[in-house]
Amino acid sequence: ERTHTGEKPFECQECHKRFTRDHHLKTHMRLHTGERPYRCEHCDRQFVQVANLRRHLRVHTGERPYGCEHCSMK
């Protein structure tokens, strides 16, 4: 429902950015606290969001999921 109403009841007390979901605020707060709970097991880099860790892991696996639309290169 909040998508359509524009309601954002969860506000960051540091920068006053507002969010529709409490877990979005919790993830955002890591930017202010410096918490990086997701660590790469290969090189020890740390990330705020698990999606960023998953994208980073491609560096180690060599995975290149996106191909060029004009040639066969990835």
UniProtKB/Swiss-Prot annotation:
A zinc finger (C2H2-type) spans 1-4, 10-32, 38-60, 66-74. GO terms for molecular function: DNA binding; zinc ion binding. GO terms for biological process: segmentation. Its main location: nucleus. Keywords: Developmental protein, DNA-binding, Gap protein, Metal-binding, Nucleus, Repeat, Zinc, Zinc-finger. One of its GO terms (cellular component) is nucleus. It is found in: Nucleus. Belongs to the krueppel C2H2-type zinc-finger protein family. Krueppel is a gap class segmentation protein. This is Protein krueppel. It comes from Tribolium castaneum. The gene is Kr.
